[in-house]
Amino acid sequence: MNEKARLLRIRAKLKRKKPRFLRQEWWRYPKFKNDPKWRRPKGIDSKMRLKKKGKPRSPSIGWSSPKAVRGLHPSGYEEVLVHNVKELEAIDPTRQAARIAGTVGARKREMILARAKELGVKVLNP
């Protein structure tokens, strides 16, 4: 069994259990509901800061994924954003995969896809 594949399976299992980390009392104010993101609770009497039972969870180092596979695509490849054919040719097909930028048009996208097939580079959004 490949070590990288094993760590990717562990990461997937950890991600299923990980809660959504949202700011304190995000349900109370509409301005927080529309833009959910983490902000550390800093209030002097904050139950969430004190990690009281029944209060939302806070992010900590224990929730992180294994360091060797952190930031990788679920397929195990490192993502590289590609804007043109020249950038595609710099990719190592054994450990990197291309993601074509959203600003690339249809004609250039076809050129990139054709060249990727020749080079054997995996494209994540064909």
Curated annotation (Swiss-Prot):
The keyword Nucleotidyltransferase does not apply. Pfam families: Ribosomal_L32e (PF01655). Keywords: Ribonucleoprotein, Ribosomal protein. Transmembrane segments: none annotated. One of its GO terms (molecular function) is structural constituent of ribosome. The keyword Protease does not apply. InterPro entries: Ribosomal_eL32, Ribosomal_eL32_arc, Ribosomal_eL32_CS, Ribosomal_eL32_sf. GO terms for biological process: translation. PROSITE patterns: RIBOSOMAL_L32E. One of its GO terms (cellular component) is cytosolic large ribosomal subunit. SUPFAM superfamilies: Ribosomal protein L32e (SSF52042). Part of the 50S ribosomal subunit. Belongs to the eukaryotic ribosomal protein eL32 family. NCBIfam families: PRK08562.1. This is Large ribosomal subunit protein eL32. It comes from Thermococcus kodakarensis (strain ATCC BAA-918 / JCM 12380 / KOD1) (Pyrococcus kodakaraensis (strain KOD1)). The lineage of its organism: Archaea, Methanobacteriati, Methanobacteriota, Thermococci, Thermococcales.
